[in-house]
């Protein structure tokens, strides 16, 4: 990582591996992260026809550290101190320093993924407009192994077990036939000079769309905590996992702390914490009913319930 400045002053640098901090008169200016520079504008494929690209970024781990220390003017210390500070900030929910880091992505995903994505309103979004542009015929078709029946436990998800290969092939063929018919109907309306804003209204949710997405690191971590969860739909989870790796290139210490405390962590209620202490003391479990079932499932699966 390299910190650059346009200010005049005496430079002091502390080099640790690939990390180099330059402090001018106690201030840190523009932050250039080598690992992030290496992947700028690179396409990371997701699903069958989608991708994510990192278009731009502002700041990294060093920016978080400097934002946290600005109140008392302390300069940058060592990489170990910085990682410890970032970890302290994240686990104690000091969010403002993380909002100093901003990432901009170019995303291509099916419309149904985009609609889940855009429920996260603390971001800036610019999506391709089908009122101005002609739509492509690119539609998402799930892999055969992704085709499953409705879950009996999760009202908004599919079952973990699949169906027979013959049924999976039949469902995929039905998807493709419906998509082809919908796109042909769209083309027919366009050829009749029907307004694009009307011709588009029956296109399938599987059609791919594109958008630019700019978000600060604090709100990005919130997005990833929800969308990289095992509870999220598999398709948007695939995008979230790619974005985690891109984010790691920009802010590796912050991403590691996020994974440890939020993505892979579990929260306990007051009564659950009391029950956990009782178990550690060799006492019985006082929780009952659904509360007990949720608590035991947290301990078993490591997933938030």
From Swiss-Prot:
Listed name of the protein: Flavin-dependent thymidylate synthase
Keyword Cell wall biogenesis/degradation: no
HAMAP family: ThyX
Keyword Iron-sulfur: no
UniProt: dUMP binding residues: 116-119, 127-131, 200, 227
Subunit architecture: Homotetramer.
Alphabetical list of Pfam families matching this protein: Thy1
Alphabetically ordered keywords of this record: FAD, Flavoprotein, Methyltransferase, NADP, Nucleotide biosynthesis, Transferase
Stated family: Belongs to the thymidylate synthase ThyX family.
GO molecular function, one term: thymidylate synthase (FAD) activity
Gene source species: Treponema pallidum (strain Nichols)
Cofactor note: Binds 4 FAD per tetramer. Each FAD binding site is formed by three monomers.
